[in-house]
Amino acid sequence: MKEIKHFISGELVGSASGKLFDNVSPANGQVIGRVHEAGRAEVDAAVRAARAALKGPWGKMTVAERAEILHRVADGITARFGEFLEARMPGHRQAEVAGQPHRHSARRANFKVFADLLKNVANEAFEMATPDGAGALNYGVRRPKGVIGVISPWNLPLLLMTWKVGPALACGNCVVVKPSEETPLTATLLGEVMQAAGVPAGVYNVVHGFGGDSAGAFLTEHPDVDAYTFTGETGTGETIMRAAAKGVRQVSLELGGKNAGIVFADCDMDKAIEGTLRSAFANCGQVCLGTERVYVERPIFDAFVARLKAGAEALKIGEPNDPEANFGPLISHKPREKVPSYYQQAVDDGATVVTGGGVPEMPAHLAGGAWVQPTIWTGLADDSAVVTEEIFGPCCHIRPFDSEEEAIELANSLPYGLASAIWTENVRRAHRVAGQIEAGIVWVNSWFLRDLRTAFGGSKQSGIGREGGVHSLEFYTELKNICVKL
């Protein structure tokens, strides 16, 4: 059984309190590791290590020198990718890629793309007139923001952690990572990769624990952290904002959503079915960008529901080392209790259960796992909690619509605005509808297609700020204007 420690100033460190918690396999419910829970002392040590590293070699390196090291980190991820999969779930044979075929390339790219981007970003400069006619020159320089608190989720642990750590380090910052208590080993393993790649001690630190009265709260309350980046539930994001307000620290928040898929009658049905199967059921529905609401134009509604049902029922539920399985368990027993409660709520609210709606029978050795069935409903009212609240499970409700205007109104009807997927072969309609959807990301005839140079983030209660490309540069650096009188 693994003992999972904190990674502070280049060393594996246990908790002074001796407090540990279980790391449990979602496939069978068995304890696979014991994790040290950070107290204030460990969090403070991690922040102090990061602050010291800012004043050390890392802070003195050129952009090109940091980029060279981060390229080695990317190569290290590739070399040990099997270990990263095993860290997420023992026996795992696939990447936690939400159905993406490029597997580990996105994790590598989170270091390589941002490292290279900074080598090619121009600084602004302006000449100005002065009363004496000599003029002055204004130019901007970017400096690291400082110590960044990175609070990352469990659903795509390596992808979403490196999405934040990569640009933060490329910009010259140092980080303290608080990974989800559900997936602790990934972050510590990345520390080993960092160390082997030549990242100086203290640049990358990891503390394990929970939210309130644990590592998460201690990190967000620490006065020497300069900014926070977080992916997770809206309520937790609000808590982090309140903590960061003391000291006026900046935050970047990618929060919850109840995303809508919109399927028009002129769509390519094969593409729409394949895309919606992914957006509803990939990673067992545990993707913040997934579409739990699907609106389908009435002329194709029945055919769409029938084909999506067939696709969902063709998914093979199985353990991680089953080469034929393409549908795994929820992350833990906490969502295993939450998701079926919504399954029951849907029935109570009068839904037609098209498929699923329960817990599958599993072999005895997997009976303790967090298994649920992929589920499709129709017939719910628009104000049902199943339609309005984020479930974060493998399920979707399908509702017909009769006009473009109605589809837009339905998609925008909730206080969330993270993502949406539109399926249509009419290019003008695609642009028109996409422009009216209140979401930070809108895909047309695709889903989860990401270019790291583009903006990523949510609107309304789905987040604050944008990361990706130059937007990450803006968040992870401070822009200073220097005015020189000529």
From Swiss-Prot:
Catalytic activity: (2Z,4E)-2-hydroxy-6-oxohexa-2,4-dienoate + NAD(+) + H2O = (2Z,4E)-2-hydroxyhexa-2,4-dienedioate + NADH + 2 H(+)
Active site: 254, 288
EC number: 1.2.1.85
Key word NAD present: yes
NAD among keywords: yes
Entry's pH dependence statement: Optimum pH is 8.3 for the oxidation of 2-hydroxymuconic semialdehyde, and 9.6 for that of benzaldehyde.
Sorted UniProt keywords: Aromatic hydrocarbons catabolism, NAD, Oxidoreductase, Plasmid
Domain of life, per lineage: Bacteria
One example of a Gene Ontology biological process annotation: benzoate catabolic process via hydroxylation
GO-annotated molecular function: oxidoreductase activity, acting on the aldehyde or oxo group of donors, NAD or NADP as acceptor
Record SUPFAM superfamilies: ALDH-like
InterPro entries: Ald_DH/histidinol_DH (IPR016161), Ald_DH_C (IPR016163), Ald_DH_CS_CYS (IPR016160), Ald_DH_CS_GLU (IPR029510), Ald_DH_N (IPR016162), Aldehyde_DH_dom (IPR015590), OHmuconic_semiald_DH (IPR017628)
Enzyme class (EC, first level): oxidoreductase
Subunit structure: Homodimer.
PANTHER family tied to this protein: 2-AMINOMUCONIC SEMIALDEHYDE DEHYDROGENASE
Name of the featured protein: 2-hydroxymuconic semialdehyde dehydrogenase
UniProt source species: Pseudomonas putida (Arthrobacter siderocapsulatus)
